[in-house]
């Protein structure tokens, strides 16, 4: 029992202590709240606390505030007549405000000022009459005296006017800062736009500025520079200085750039297949052969080096180049020696069909004009300024060989070089077996300058069987 009593006493003491602490905390909060309201509003006339264990703040309207101020002044008055007069004035002001609110609700927004002025005049006239009868000042006289003497109106109104002036100054200051910030942003934008417009013409001018050739007297070579040029091995003049000779004109340059694509456009599919066939060592027959692909490449490279030393090429020099190539090929043929009789007699025979007669022996090919026309075209020679390209040297060996027609075609010329000894004149190419085939080399690779030691090939027939 004693323990229970002790516990009850302790809990009661703790409750008292907690209540004291809570009340003191609420008082401190109330003081802070009132300080904030006074700092904002200037006075605590509109603030009112509710009654109860936990008081709550409540703000009164401004009209009630005026009544409260009159009550405060009436309390200060020493005689009861002033207290009654203050109450009567508060009632009059309340009635007047209610009447004005009713009039404003009934009338429109456009007639608010016109409708409120007569009512105010009537109320002022009634107040004047009453003041004359009672000998007391009216509301307007009190308002005028309050404006003239701010100290009589109380310290709250004076503080509110000063704070209002400060707020107006702060507002104007903020407006000026915002205006300055906007102007700074606009000026920065204009500067960036101007900077971009000044840079763009310089870039375009540098990109489209034509390059000038010193050899052509300042003539612009913009067109030639914009076109895709040949690779580095076809342009040995790139490493030269501008003072060295060897600049070709624009037409030569364009033809050199087009010479890259020349073998692809010139060689037909038949020629390509024929060249691949003759490149294959399994298709080679014993006997005299034309220079190989590597020999043509070496000759083309040597000619390219000679031509790149600065000489411009004309039509006559092109013909001289072709004759030089032909002479070299003839020398190589002579070095290898003419085809002996034993080699000719040991040529592999074609498989013959017993039902087909051999009525078309191989005859000589007298078409020198065709070879004279074909050589300049296959070597890439034209009447304009043309340079010998290394790529043409690679493909030149392929183009000099005449290809075998496909199986489905019937040859139109009986004296063609491609015919085999075993083909028939009436059956065509269909019954012939596919045998590796080597065409006879051309009799003459010249341009009409003269016969150069290859006449022993002309007029001789190819022997297909063994000697005996």
Swiss-Prot record:
Q: Where is the composition biased (Basic and acidic residues)?
A: 139-150, 415-426
Segments for region (Disordered): 113-157, 202-245, 329-468
Task: Name the InterPro entries on file.
Answer: IQCC
The residue ranges of the IQ domain are 6-35
Tell me the PANTHER family matching this sequence: IQ DOMAIN-CONTAINING PROTEIN C
Name of the protein in its database record: IQ domain-containing protein C
Give the gene that encodes this protein.
Answer: IQCC
